[in-house]
């Protein structure tokens, strides 16, 4: 199959295999070794060994070759708890009340086009309201295979296909389907590299753009890259998020959220749609 359209422009990436086409030759071996290790670590673990929590599984993409596995993952998780929106999850944490049961709140980072084409139909079919954190400067963008930002900021390893992002029309369509559009900054930057004033502008300008274009409140923020004190400053940027009018800040820390936990320190579990049940069982049973 050709990697370019009739006009010579690289066609959009459609599969995870295309997204990772330039992985080194030993990448499959590393993935196999990791899978074997996780199978061993998952022995005896159960997602429902504990209760009274909210977990925040998050993804970046659902490409064509990931759709079936993504649907299978959601159906698997539905056997252990209830899916709730980030608005409801944060309201529960804000209340300080008891969390009675097990809840999953799904989100996606970066705003790739596959959120619309791959994830949305599967989520909507199941009545799941997911959050999508978008980079507002990337709305409507298409990055070439050799684009430095595509590789540096979004982990793109495509060979002959481009990386396509959501448009504002896409975001409005998703919002009409019950999805929630959150901010992943104006640009995909490490807030830790910025002064407080510049960081505040990233939060406030992206929030304003989303509210203007989508016509709904943008109440949730997720710093790019996600690791506190490395990629952003938890105290400083949490304070900036509160002052800007956000209700939550999502991190890349793994683990469950429980009664009394701070919605400006949301822990989330990164997943890939193609992973098997043993991988979900391991990561979603961690404290």
Locations of regions flagged by a protein language model:
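C-terminal active-site subregion of NodB/CE4 polysaccharide deacetylases
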Residues: 2-107, 113-114, 193-287
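Short beta-strand and adjacent tight-turn residues that come in two discontinuous sequence segments
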Residues: 133, 184, 249-251
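Short, flexible active-site loops
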Residues: 184-192
């Amino acid at each position: 199959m050709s990697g370019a359209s009739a006009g010579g422009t690289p066609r959009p990436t459609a599969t995870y295999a295309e997204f990772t086409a330039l992985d080194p030759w030993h990448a499959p071996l590393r993935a196999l070794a990791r899978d074997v290790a996780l199978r061993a670590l998952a022995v005896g673990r159960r997602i429902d060994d504990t209760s009274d929590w909210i977990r925040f599984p998050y993804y970046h993409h659902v490409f064509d070759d990931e759709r079936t596995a993504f649907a299978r993952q959601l159906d698997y998780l539905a056997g252990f708890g209830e899916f709730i929106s980030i608005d409801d999850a944060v309201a529960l944490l804000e209340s300080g009340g008891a969390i009675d049961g097990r809840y999953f709140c799904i989100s996606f980072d970066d705003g790739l086009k596959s959120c619309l084409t791959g994830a949305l139909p599967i989520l909507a079919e199941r009545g799941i309201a997911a959050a999508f954190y978008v980079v507002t400067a990337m709305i409507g963008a298409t990055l070439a295979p050799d684009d430095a930002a595509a590789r540096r900021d979004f982990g793109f390893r495509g060979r002959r296909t481009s990386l396509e992002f959501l448009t504002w029309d896409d975001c409005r369509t998703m919002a009409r389907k019950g999805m929630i559009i959150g901010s992943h900054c104006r640009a995909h930057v490490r807030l830790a590299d910025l002064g407080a004033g510049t960081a505040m502008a990233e939060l406030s300008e992206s929030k304003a753009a989303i509210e203007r274009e989508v016509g709904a409140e943008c109440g949730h923020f997720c710093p790019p890259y996600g690791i506190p004190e490395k990629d952003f400053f938890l105290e400083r940027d949490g304070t900036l998020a509160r002052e800007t009018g956000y209700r939550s800040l999502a991190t890349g820390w793994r683990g469950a959220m429980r009664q009394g936990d701070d919605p400006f320190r949301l822990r989330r579990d990164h997943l890939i749609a193609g992973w098997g049940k043993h991988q979900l069982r391991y990561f979603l049973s961690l404290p």
